[in-house]
Amino acid sequence: MEKSYSESYAAAGVDITAGYRSVELMKQYVARTMNEHCIGGLGGFGGLFELDCTGYKHPVLISGTDGVGTKLKIAMIMDKHDTIGIDCVAMCVNDVICAGSKPLVFLDYIACGRNIPEKIAEIVKGVAEGCVQADCSLVGGETAEHPGMMPEEEYDLAGFTVGVVDKEKILSNETMAAGDVILALPSTGVHSNGFSLVRKIFDIDANPDVLHTAPAELGGKTLGEALLAPTKIYVKPVLKVLEEVDVKGISHITGGGFYENIPRSLKKGCCARINKADVRTPALFQLMQKTGNISEHDMFNTFNMGVGMVLTVPAEQADKALDILHANGEPEAYRLGVIAEGEGVELC
């Protein structure tokens, strides 16, 4: 079928032809995420996915949506767009696995000042890679050109995921008790939260060239490279643990750091007792704290501090959980703390 073209619409700033070109360029990446449950291809009004309920007594769907925040500004300055999509997927799927669910499908939304097909394809390349890592299918998306609302070179990125979990296996903290062990799954860096403060610490908006410097603390990486490290996707190792261990709670450490996110999975009357000396904090966070003269409390209340996800498990199953994590892509997972009587997070 011949593609349509509108000179009037193009004159208003919306290039339909660029949209077609973007879709053609991204098809090869989207194809990597498809499986036998996907029905149809790109171009429909909705993404179709056949739900296989085999093995589920009472399947429950869980949805999540998120974006990448102002980490996008770092990607734009560095002109590197092929990993920011991984961040978008990670922010969504890491949230829904906190209920014990397996992500099934993902959709993305890109708003841009001008549709530059090669750039859009690079963004979607990252989204597709994130979907592969999370073992879910990229079944649809939208690229919206916003002339007059956004500068031509800028874009925003958001995503949406749906997962499934058996109702009887939805994670519950009802049996959480003092003595349970908190396990840490290391992050790859700042992940996708706190970048407004990061930009202020390094004065990035006024001095973007700082991203091309290589502070000694970063072991040869530039600041921009360290900050753009993609958010880790924890789906596969966590699902493996859930198969064999009585996990009592999972927290994805995002905006708000330890103090906001760990309590979200705690039972009332329980607190997370963590020795600060046991937190394996990467050099990047130490550089940020020193450069910005940020208090320790604010660091733990804003950033993940090197811990991207925590699992709470019975003490007698902690070693087994660590063995599973170590064998499934999380070789550096470690004991972070214990559950005690109280409320919230106790960093001592």
Feature names for model-found ranges:
Residues 156, 169-222:
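Short, acidic (Asp/Glu-rich) active-site segment that either coordinates a divalent metal cofactor
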Residues 23, 121-124, 195:
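Hydrophobic face of alpha-helices
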Residues 2-37:
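N-terminal amphipathic/basic leader segments beginning at the initiator methionine
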Residues 54, 67-68, 162-166, 188-190, ...:
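Short, glycine-/Ser/Thr-/acidic-enriched flexible segments
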Residues 22, 26, 48, 92-93, ...:
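Buried hydrophobic packing segments
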Residues 2-12, 119-137, 150-157, 207-211, ...:
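Glycine-/charge-enriched secondary-structure boundary and capping motifs
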Residues 15, 66, 179, 252, ...:
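Residue-level signature of catalytic and energy-coupling elements of molecular machines
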Residues 28-188:
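Glycine-rich phosphate/pyrophosphate-binding loop regions near the starts of catalytic domains
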